[in-house]
Amino acid sequence: MTHNTILGILVSSMISLPALAEVKIGYIDMQKAIQETAAGKKAKKDLEDEFNKKKKDLEKKEADIKKMHEDFEKRSMAMNEDARMKKQNEIRTEMGKYQETAAKAQMEIQKKERDLTQPIVTKLRSILEDIAKKEDFTVVLEKSENSVMWAKKEIDLTDRLIKAYDSKK
């Protein structure tokens, strides 16, 4: 190798080292941030209340169907074929309605969860962007099973994000 080539490699490596030293990385746990903000806790409670109400309604319908089925079992021997078929169809119809109601309730709960958490996520992202710009972070990663395998606790911005969110009510 010529002297100029070696000098070029040496100079270029020196130039790139300071650039690497200026990279500032942080991460957040978005799920934790959502769950631990005051708004997130309220959303969780509202969601649990809605879920428990729907669950109670479904449990009552399930108990009614179970009672219908038990009554049918007790009386089926005394029924003629037409009455037995009619009662079985009635039980099947009620079971189908129950399953539709359960599926609808699940979809409503999922929609409500999205509706409650989306504004929180939007505000968290905005606050995070402010923190990252103000403190000159190069990149902020979201902690999840597949993205951040390990990182120093010092670069975890989650608690700061939660505090900033709750202070901006």
Region roles according to the model:
Residues 1-2:
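N-terminal hydrophobic targeting signals that begin at the initiator methionine
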Residues 5-14:
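Sec-dependent N-terminal signal peptides
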Residues 15-21:
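Sec/Tat signal peptide C-region and signal peptidase I cleavage site
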Residues 17, 166-169:
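Generic C-terminal helix-cap and adjacent flexible tail
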Residues 22-148, 167-168:
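Amphipathic alpha-helical segments
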Residues 149-153:
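Short, exposed beta-strand-loop hairpins at the edges of beta-sheets
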